[in-house]
């Protein structure tokens, strides 16, 4: 059965609805990125779905379309702050900042996951990137934004292969850590090797 990705946007049709998702909760290196997107219900971009279900090429194409046609914002929390406040709090902070940075003030904020927020506008949705078009669009913007950041960092530290693994704990990444030690961009609070 096909899921109506606009179900929640339609449910809250009298409100300005933003979707939020993050990228980078699980990697061993780099920041966590959250993105907020307010879609235009009169201009639905075809092909938007959870970023994990898209090829890199398709994500890049949709990223350009989303950021050109919809209201959006992103927030980046560094690996240093992740180590200071923990990944959950860093993710929540990134989500809150992304929502606050939107040029339109959202009245309802649909967030992928099950994180509790003090702000009553925030509605957490488990598997939200498969249930809401706004969240799916945000997942694409967050993923592409973070992947581009990690690609930039990989030019400084090519031995960790971040251009391929985006900082995640792949076999090759862990082998590189064991051989070269941690880079300045590795999260110290994440135990991996």
UniProtKB/Swiss-Prot annotation:
Predominant subcellular localization, coarse grouping: cytoplasm
Residues reported in the UniProt entry to bind a divalent metal cation: 21-22, 112
UniProt keywords, alphabetically: Cytoplasm, Endonuclease, Hydrolase, Manganese, Metal-binding, Nuclease
Zinc listed as a keyword: no
All copies of domain RNase H type-2, residue ranges: 15-193
Nuclease in keyword set: yes
SUPFAM superfamilies from the UniProt entry: Ribonuclease H-like
EC number: 3.1.26.4
GO cellular component terms, semicolon-separated: cytoplasm; ribonuclease H2 complex
EC class (word): hydrolase
GO molecular function, one term: manganese ion binding
Known cofactor(s): Mn(2+); Mg(2+)
Record-level GO BP terms: DNA replication, removal of RNA primer; mismatch repair
Record note on cofactor: Manganese or magnesium. Binds 1 divalent metal ion per monomer in the absence of substrate. May bind a second metal ion after substrate binding.
Subcellular location: Cytoplasm
Catalytic activity: Endonucleolytic cleavage to 5'-phosphomonoester
Function: Endonuclease that specifically degrades the RNA of RNA-DNA hybrids.
Family the entry assigns: Belongs to the RNase HII family.
Name of this protein: Ribonuclease HII
